[in-house]
């Protein structure tokens, strides 16, 4: 996986100069755990592709994951499936997030589900999270939901 991404980076200037997946990223991926290749590939996509700045780089990561692991990843449906969220977060944490979203009167758009899933999965592994985006994108709401669900303040 790492070797193929590295090869594509060198041949096509994918991931720009400094935005490439590091060994640290791969270790983080390994620490997340998975039940089968499909879940492993989806977790890898969440960790590697979602941090890219360009859609073509995310597509390259998806292509490599699908080629190496022989699975299919549908980024559009990835965060809309309850089984993906439950696998990433656990059924109890998913229920807590849904309850917190109702409490905060959040509408579960696909962008909001994606942001909540990525943020909660990182925090569950005690990984730092930096939310950057346009005003009104839902960053504060995501922090409120996740803080309520995890029962701890976020800074």
Name these PLM-found stretches.
Residues 124, 128-155:
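Walker A/P-loop
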Residues 1-117, 121, 125:
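Alpha-helical lid/collar subdomain of P-loop NTPases
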């Amino acid at each position: 996986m790492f070797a193929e991404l590295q090869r594509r980076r060198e041949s096509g200037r994918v991931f720009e100069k400094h935005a490439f997946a590091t060994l640290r990223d791969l270790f983080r991926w390994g620490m997340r755990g998975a039940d089968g290749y499909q879940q492993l590939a989806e977790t890898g996509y969440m960790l590697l592709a979602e941090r890219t700045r360009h859609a073509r780089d995310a597509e390259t990561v998806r292509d490599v994951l699908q080629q190496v692991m022989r699975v299919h990843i549908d980024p559009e449906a990835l965060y809309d499936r309850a089984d993906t969220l439950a696998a990433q977060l656990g059924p109890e944490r998913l229920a807590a997030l849904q309850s917190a979203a109702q409490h905060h009167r959040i509408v579960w758009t696909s962008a909001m589900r994606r942001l909540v899933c990525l943020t909660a999965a990182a925090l569950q592994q005690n990984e730092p999270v930096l939310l950057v985006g346009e005003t009104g994108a839902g960053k504060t709401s995501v922090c409120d939901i996740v803080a309520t669900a995890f029962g701890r303040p976020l800074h």
